[in-house]
C-alpha cells in the first residue's frame, strides 16, 4: 500500500511550511513515495527548504511516470515536430489538453482519447476497468462535450491460464457495468490473448464526445478572485498513490496483493448525474475553466489549472467534503476518489453554479480562489501546508533521456523466419487450417464478451456488431456521423517497432475507411515495459517515430494520447503494444458500408490490394507452431490513402454493398466473418496460378474484401484501374447457399463455422 495510506491519522505536530523551514534535517520517506535522490534534492532547491509532508506527497504523485511523462516526454515531442500546419487546421485542441478536439464541419466538433488503466485492472479487475472507463469519460466531459460512446482495447494472458478467468471476468463486467450504467454504447474494440500479458493485462479505454464548437472548454485558472469549486463525489481513501504505486512501477513476485488499497472505487450513477450537471453548467455559461480529478486527484487538478492560467491559487483543503474520518492533508490532496470535477467560476456566477448542482443533487463546495500571485498555496485549518510554484509541480518536472539500445536478440529474432514452417497444401489441410484458426482464442467470436455491453443505447449507433469500425450519427437533420476504430499488434511491433506502429495505424485507418468514412485524426495509448530497460526504450522510440512519420504520410494529426510504462513482472515485459485510434467523418451515415454479405442478390466479391507471401508474426504461425520471428508485413501508407479514397468514392456512389479489411487470419478470416455477419454463403474462385495457402491466409497489409452489386462491377473495376488500385474478382455471394466454398478445394457450412467460432470463449470463461 502507499506510504500515504500508512501515515498516522493524527500526529503531534502538523507539518506546515513554517515547521518545514525550521526542521531542515527531518527524515522524509521520499524513496517509498517513488522519488529518486536527485528528484528529492531538486524539490528542496525549488522550495529553498525541505518540503512539507503534504508537498512531498504532491510532488511524488505529480512527478511520477504516469503524470509527468518524464521518460517519454523528450520523444513525444516528435509528434509535434512532424505535424504540419495543414494537419493542424482542423484541430481545436491537441496534445496537452484533457483530450484532442477536431472540427468535423457544420459547427460540430468531436473529442476523443484513449487511456490505460492497466495495473489497477490486474490488482482489482472490476473496479480497475470500471474506473478506467469513468476516468476517460470525465476527460471528455472536461472539454465541454457530451460523451456519446466508448470502445476498449483489452489484452489478457493465455486463455487457458488459471488467472486469466479472474482478470477477464472482472474487467469485462467492470467495463459493461460502468458503461452500460452511463448509457454509453460500446461500439467496438479488440481482445487479444498472449502469455506475455498474464501478469500485466492491458485495459485501454477510449471515449468519444460531441460538442458544438462554441461550447469548447479548457483546463486553466485565470482572473484573480474567481472561485475554485469542487463538485461531485466526496473524497475518500481509495486510489491514494495509484499513479505512483501502481502505474509507475513494475509488479514484483508478490504480484498485486500489497497494492489493493491503491485501486479506486467507481459509482457510474454518480457519474451519469455529473455528466448532465456539467452540460447544464456549460449551457449556462457558468464555467471559466474546468479539470476532472483522475490520477493524483486534487494535486493534479489544482496544480494544472494554476499552471495553465495567468495567476496563482489558494485552496482551503479542510473545506473538501470527506467520506473517511481523520484523513491527513496529504491523503485529501492525493486521493483518487472518482466522479469529481474542479471548476473555475466567476464570483457573480457562484450562486447559479451551486443551484445547478443542487438541482442534480451533486455536492459542490467552494474550496479556494484564483490569486494574482504565482504560487499555489494550500491551507489546512488555517495553517499553510503547501506553498509551491505550480508549474514546477504540473509542467516542469524531471525529464529523462533514458539509455536507448537495440536489443542484442533482435537480429536473431528477425532471422527466425516462418518460411521454415510446414504449410497446408491439400484442400483438406486448408480446411483444417481455417477451422483451427477460427477455433482458436485469437480469431474466435468475441460475442461472449461484447454481448455484455450495450451497443445501441441512445439510438445513434449505426455500425458496431461485426463492423471494422464503430459508427455514430451526430446530426439527425443532416445524417452527419463519425466512425472510430482502435488497433494494435504487439507481435508485429516486437519484430519491428517502427513498422509495427505503422501497421497498427494503417489497420485502424483502413477500418475507418471500409465503413465509408474519411479518416481525419489519431489518438494513441503506448503500452510498454520498463523505461529503465534500454531495449524497451528502443522499442518505444522506434514506435513513436513510426507512428508520427506514418501520420505525417497520411496527413492526419495525433491529437493526444497516453503512455503506460512498467507493464512487466520482474524482468519479463509485455509485447510492445502501441494502441492506435483513428477518427473518421462521414457526411451521411445512410451511405455507410456494412460488413455482412448478401445485401444485394448475386454480389461479386473482389479483393483490393496486393497479396504477398507474408506470414512472419501471423496468427497462422502462432496457432499452428507457436512461432514468433522474422519481419512484419510491408507497410505502404500511400496505398492505404489510395484505398481509403476509393472506398469513400464507392460509398458515395453506391458502388460497394459490403466491405471488410484483411488483417489477422487474412482473406479466409475476412470471408468467414463477412459471410457469418450476413448469414449468407459464398463461392470463392481463386485466380489461376495463385498459391491457395498464400492467398487465403497471408496477412499482407493494405487489402480489403468488397462485395459489389452485379450492376456496378464494371464501374467499380474501372474506378480501381483508373486510380491504380489492384482489384481481383475472387468469387460471388450465393444467397441460396449455407456454406463458404473455395472452388476445387473445400467447403464449410455456415453452421459449422459459427459453432466453431462461438464455442471457444464460453469453453474457457463460461
Swiss-Prot record:
Q: Which GO terms describe its molecular function?
A: ATP binding; magnesium ion binding; phosphoribosylformylglycinamidine synthase activity
Would the keyword Metal-binding be found if you checked this record's keyword annotation?
yes
Q: What class of enzyme is it?
A: ligase
Q: Which reaction does it catalyse?
A: N(2)-formyl-N(1)-(5-phospho-beta-D-ribosyl)glycinamide + L-glutamine + ATP + H2O = 2-formamido-N(1)-(5-O-phospho-beta-D-ribosyl)acetamidine + L-glutamate + ADP + phosphate + H(+)
Q: Which InterPro entries has this protein been placed in? A: PRibForGlyAmidine_synth_PurL, PurL_linker, PurM-like_C_dom, PurM-like_C_sf, PurM-like_N, PurM-like_N_sf
Enzyme Commission no: 6.3.5.3
Q: Does the keyword Cytoplasm apply?
A: yes
Q: Could you describe the subunit structure of this protein?
A: Monomer. Part of the FGAM synthase complex composed of 1 PurL, 1 PurQ and 2 PurS subunits.
Known function: Part of the phosphoribosylformylglycinamidine synthase complex involved in the purines biosynthetic pathway. Catalyzes the ATP-dependent conversion of formylglycinamide ribonucleotide (FGAR) and glutamine to yield formylglycinamidine ribonucleotide (FGAM) and glutamate. The FGAM synthase complex is composed of three subunits. PurQ produces an ammonia molecule by converting glutamine to glutamate. PurL transfers the ammonia molecule to FGAR to form FGAM in an ATP-dependent manner.
Task: State what protein this is by name.
Answer: Phosphoribosylformylglycinamidine synthase subunit PurL
Q: Which organism is it from?
A: Mycobacterium tuberculosis (strain ATCC 25618 / H37Rv)
Source organism phylogeny: Bacteria, Bacillati, Actinomycetota, Actinomycetes, Mycobacteriales
Q: Which gene encodes it?
A: purL
Amino acid at each position: 500500500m502507499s506510504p500515504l495510506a500508512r501515515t498516522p491519522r493524527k500526529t503531534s505536530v502538523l507539518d506546515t511550511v513554517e515547521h518545514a523551514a525550521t526542521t531542515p534535517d527531518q527524515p522524509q520517506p521520499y524513496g517509498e513515495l517513488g522519488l529518486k535522490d536527485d528528484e528529492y534534492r531538486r524539490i528542496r532547491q525549488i522550495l529553498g527548504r525541505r518540503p512539507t509532508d503534504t508537498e512531498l506527497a504532491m510532488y511524488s504523485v505529480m512527478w511520477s511516470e504516469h503524470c509527468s511523462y518524464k521518460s517519454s516526454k523528450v520523444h513525444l515531442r516528435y509528434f509535434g515536430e512532424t505535424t504540419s500546419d495543414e494537419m493542424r487546421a482542423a484541430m481545436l485542441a491537441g496534445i496537452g489538453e484533457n483530450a484532442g478536439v477536431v472540427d468535423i464541419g457544420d459547427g460540430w466538433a468531436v473529442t476523443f482519447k484513449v487511456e490505460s488503466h492497466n495495473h489497477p485492472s490486474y490488482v482489482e479487475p472490476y473496479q480497475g476497468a470500471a474506473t478506467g472507463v469513468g476516468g476517460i469519460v470525465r476527460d471528455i466531459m472536461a472539454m465541454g462535450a457530451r460523451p456519446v460512446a466508448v470502445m476498449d482495447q483489452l489484452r489478457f494472458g493465455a486463455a487457458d491460464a488459471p488467472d486469466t478467468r479472474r482478470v477477464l471476468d472482472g474487467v469485462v463486467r467492470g467495463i459493461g457495468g460502468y458503461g452500460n450504467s452511463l448509457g454509453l454504447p460500446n461500439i467496438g474494440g479488440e481482445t487479444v490473448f498472449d502469455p506475455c500479458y498474464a501478469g500485466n493485462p492491458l485495459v485501454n479505454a477510449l471515449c468519444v464526445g460531441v460538442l458544438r464548437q462554441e461550447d469548447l472548454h479548457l483546463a486553466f485558472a485565470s482572473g484573480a478572485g474567481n472561485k475554485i469549486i469542487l463538485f461531485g463525489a466526496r473524497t475518500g481513501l481509495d486510489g491514494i498513490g495509484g499513479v505512483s504505486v501502481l502505474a509507475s512501477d513494475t509488479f514484483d513476485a508478490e504480484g498485486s496483493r500489497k497494492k489493493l488499497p491503491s485501486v479506486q472505487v467507481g459509482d457510474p450513477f454518480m457519474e451519469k448525474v455529473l455528466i448532465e450537471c456539467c452540460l447544464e453548467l456549460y449551457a449556462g455559461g457558468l464555467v471559466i475553466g474546468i479539470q476532472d480529478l483522475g490520477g493524483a486527484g486534487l494535486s493534479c487538478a489544482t496544480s494544472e489549472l494554476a499552471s495553465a492560467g495567468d495567476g496563482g491559487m489558494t485552496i482551503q483543503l479542510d473545506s473538501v467534503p470527506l467520506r473517511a474520518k481523520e484523513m491527513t492533508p496529504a491523503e485529501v490532496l492525493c486521493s483518487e476518489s472518482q466522479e469529481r470535477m474542479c471548476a473555475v467560476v466567476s464570483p457573480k456566477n457562484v450562486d447559479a453554479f451551486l443551484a445547478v448542482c443542487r438541482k442534480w443533487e451533486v455536492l459542490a463546495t467552494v474550496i479556494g480562489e484564483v490569486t494574482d500571485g504565482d504560487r499555489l498555496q494550500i491551507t489546512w485549518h488555517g495553517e499553510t501546508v503547501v506553498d509551491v510554484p505550480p508549474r514546477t509541480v504540473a509542467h516542469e518536472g524531471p525529464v529523462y533521456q533514458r539509455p536507448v539500445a537495440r536489443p542484442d536478440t533482435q537480429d536473431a529474432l528477425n532471422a527466425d523466419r516462418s518460411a521454415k514452417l510446414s504449410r497446408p497444401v491439400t484442400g483438406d489441410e486448408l480446411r483444417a487450417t481455417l477451422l483451427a484458426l477460427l477455433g482458436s482464442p485469437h480469431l474466435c467470436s468475441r460475442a461472449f464478451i461484447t454481448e455484455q455491453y450495450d451497443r445501441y443505447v441512445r439510438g445513434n449507433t449505426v455500425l458496431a456488431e461485426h463492423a471494422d469500425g464503430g459508427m455514430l450519427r451526430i446530426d439527425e437533420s443532416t445524417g452527419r456521423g463519425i466512425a472510430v476504430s482502435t488497433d494494435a499488434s504487439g507481435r508485429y511491433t516486437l519484430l519491428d517497432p517502427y513498422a509495427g506502429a505503422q501497421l497498427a495505424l494503417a489497420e485502424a485507418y483502413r477500418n475507418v475507411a471500409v465503413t465509408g468514412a474519411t479518416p481525419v485524426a489519431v489518438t494513441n495509448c503506448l503500452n510498454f515495459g520498463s523505461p529503465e530497460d534500454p531495449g524497451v526504450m528502443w522499442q518505444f522510440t522506434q514506435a513513436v517515430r513510426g507512428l508520427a512519420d506514418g501520420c505525417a504520410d497520411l496527413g492526419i494529426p495525433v491529437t493526444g494520447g497516453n503512455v503506460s510504462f512498467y507493464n512487466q513482472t520482474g524482468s519479463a515485459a509485455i509485447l510492445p503494444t502501441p494502441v492506435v485510434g483513428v477518427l473518421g467523418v462521414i457526411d451521411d451515415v445512410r451511405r455507410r458500408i456494412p460488413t455482412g454479405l448478401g445485401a444485394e442478390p448475386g454480389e461479386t466479391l473482389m479483393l483490393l490490394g496486393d497479396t504477398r507471401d507474408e506470414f512472419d508474426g501471423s496468427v497462422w504461425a502462432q496457432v499452428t507452431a507457436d512461432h514468433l520471428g522474422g519481419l512484419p508485413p510491408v507497410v505502404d501508407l500511400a496505398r492505404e490513402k489510395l484505398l481509403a479514397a476509393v472506398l469513400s468514392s464507392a460509398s458515395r456512389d453506391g458502388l460497394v454493398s459490403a466491405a471488410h479489411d484483411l488483417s489477422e487470419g487474412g482473406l479466409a478470416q475476412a470471408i468467414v466473418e463477412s459471410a457469418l455477419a450476413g448469414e449468407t454463403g459464398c463461392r470463392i474462385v481463386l485466380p489461376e496460378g495463385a498459391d491457395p495457402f498464400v492467398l487465403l491466409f497471408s496477412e499482407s497489409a493494405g487489402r480489403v474484401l468488397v462485395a459489389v452489386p452485379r450492376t456496378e462491377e464494371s464501374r467499380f473495376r474501372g474506378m480501381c484501374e483508373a486510380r491504380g488500385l489492384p482489384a481481383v474478382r475472387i468469387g460471388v455471394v450465393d444467397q441460396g447457399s449455407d456454406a463458404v466454398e473455395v472452388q476445387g478445394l473445400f467447403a464449410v457450412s455456415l453452421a459449422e463455422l459459427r459453432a466453431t467460432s462461438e464455442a471457444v470463449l464460453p469453453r474457457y470463461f463460461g
